[in-house]
Structure formats: C-alpha cells, structure tokens
C-alpha cells in the first residue's frame, strides 16, 4: 500500500486520517497544529488529529510553522508517495508539495472553485447556499488553486449549522479520497482545471464579523448564527451586554419598527431587523453563563425589556 504523510487538525481531518489507516495506507508521519490552552484554567487540549495519531502510535509532528522548520527537513527525507491534507491550517512550502512521489492531495470542504480559503463551510451556510460538497484536488503553491481530481456534493438543510455540515462532509470527503487515491496512483484519473472566472474566496471569519449587524435582514442574521455555530458563535450587544445567539428563526410577521427594537418578550423574544423583518431568538448565552433556551432567559431577564424599545446597540 502507498505511503502517506498526513496533515490535518480538526475532526474533519481526524475522520479522513482514520479512513486512511483503516484502508491500510502506510502513514509515515502525521502533522498537526500545536496544542492549545483553553479556558480559565488554561487546560492543554490536543487536536482531534493528534488524538488519532497517538491512538495508533503514529510519528507525530507539531511545528508552529512548517516552513523552514527542522520538522520540514525530516519530512522531506521520508520520501512519501502521497502528501495528504485535510483542514490543516498552515501554508505548505512548494518544495514539500513537490517531494511527493505520486501527488500532493488536499481534501477541501467546498465545490471548488467556489470558496477557496480557510472557511468554506461557514461561507456556504452564511450565504444561504442550498448545497456544498468536497473537492479532492492537487495542491500547488497558490491556495486551493490546484487541478481537481473529484467532487461530491451535499445538500445543506435550512436550519443546519456549520458544525452539522462539517460532521456530514467529513465522511463524504474520506470516502471520496479513498475512492480517488488508487486512480491517481494508477494514472487513470484526468485532472480538471478550475475555472478562474468562477473563483470565490472564503477567508477566515474576522472578529468583527461575529457581531450580528442591524444592517442584516432577519434571514441573513439567522444564516450568520448558523454559520458561526459551534465556533466562535455570533452575538448581539443588548443594552451594553454581549449576548451570544446559538439558534434563531425568521418570524412570520413583519414590523414597522426600525432595526434593533424589541417587538415582544411575551412567549418569544422578537427583534426587528433590516427590511422590516423580525428574528425570534431561540437559544442564547449571556456573558459568563451557559447556553439556555429563550424561555429560561426571559424568566430571568425578560422584565428588563419593554416592547417597542430599542434594545440592540448599534454596531
């Protein structure tokens, strides 16, 4: 079986790596991002890919930056048939990509050339797309610009979050990769170049974009909330306090109130948005507290708000 250097970090990558192991590929090395410290206690957390590597006693590398590192020199000496990445999160040096004896291959979470970059799934959900997919592609120096070996599509349900789409895309990408690698090795597959006129970029979501703008319609706000669930979460600033919103729905009613006003806090928490639209908040998380259903939030804080008043601060 062919030899592989695998690079990945989140669960998406871990699912792909597990598939390669079960299929019998010879994993020469696993490369993942350095451990993170999270929470108040700064607990060290391993990436899902690291967990898989440790469970299977695979050689593990965690460079802060692969380019010009000692780890890169070691990896270049491994002489792998395939270099395979799945949501790794770092730029890869061209000389490393060219060192693969057969091919350097990426499992990308979109239907390229749409959504090149680090946040393809979040962009698909935020833009309200009806479908997304995975692309098995050749890696080149330019980000996500290589020729395509294969694609598979996946519908996005109207209420689905990025996290849920990720969970469905991972096995789809794994299976498509395992189906495609033998065809690459045998030379029977024909690569397809990307149409440069159809390229759309999906750079990492910025901190500023996490705030739900009052310039959005209720539908656009709902899509942003879905896109940033489970990480990092979208939020409103209500009377000076940050309130994360994990789930919301577009209300059937419209309003003449300007954006940012409370329609009602009786039985629901309905806020006006652009275009006379209304958003019902369904699950929220006040600062320093756990996520809660809107009825629990209203039981504790509902009396602070009056129907008809402006409660959302301008962004």
Swiss-Prot record:
PROSITE patterns: GART (PS00373)
Catalysis: reaction(s): L-methionyl-tRNA(fMet) + (6R)-10-formyltetrahydrofolate = N-formyl-L-methionyl-tRNA(fMet) + (6S)-5,6,7,8-tetrahydrofolate + H(+)
An annotated GO cellular component: cytosol
Organism taxonomic ancestry: Bacteria, Bacillati, Bacillota, Bacilli, Lactobacillales
PANTHER family: METHIONYL-TRNA FORMYLTRANSFERASE, METHIONYL-TRNA FORMYLTRANSFERASE, MITOCHONDRIAL
Binding residue positions for (6S)-5,6,7,8-tetrahydrofolate: 110-113
Top enzyme class: transferase
Protein family (similarity comment): Belongs to the Fmt family.
Listed SUPFAM superfamilies: FMT C-terminal domain-like, Formyltransferase
Xref: InterPro entries: Fmt, Formyl_trans_C, Formyl_trans_C_sf, Formyl_transf_N, Formyl_transf_N_sf, Formyl_transferase-like_C_sf, GART_AS, Met-tRNA-FMT_C
UniProt name for this protein: Methionyl-tRNA formyltransferase
Keywords in alphabetical order: Protein biosynthesis, Transferase
GO MF terms held by the record: methionyl-tRNA formyltransferase activity
Stored NCBIfam families: fmt
Pfam families linked to this entry: Formyl_trans_C, Formyl_trans_N
Organism: Lactobacillus delbrueckii subsp. bulgaricus (strain ATCC BAA-365 / Lb-18)
EC number: 2.1.2.9
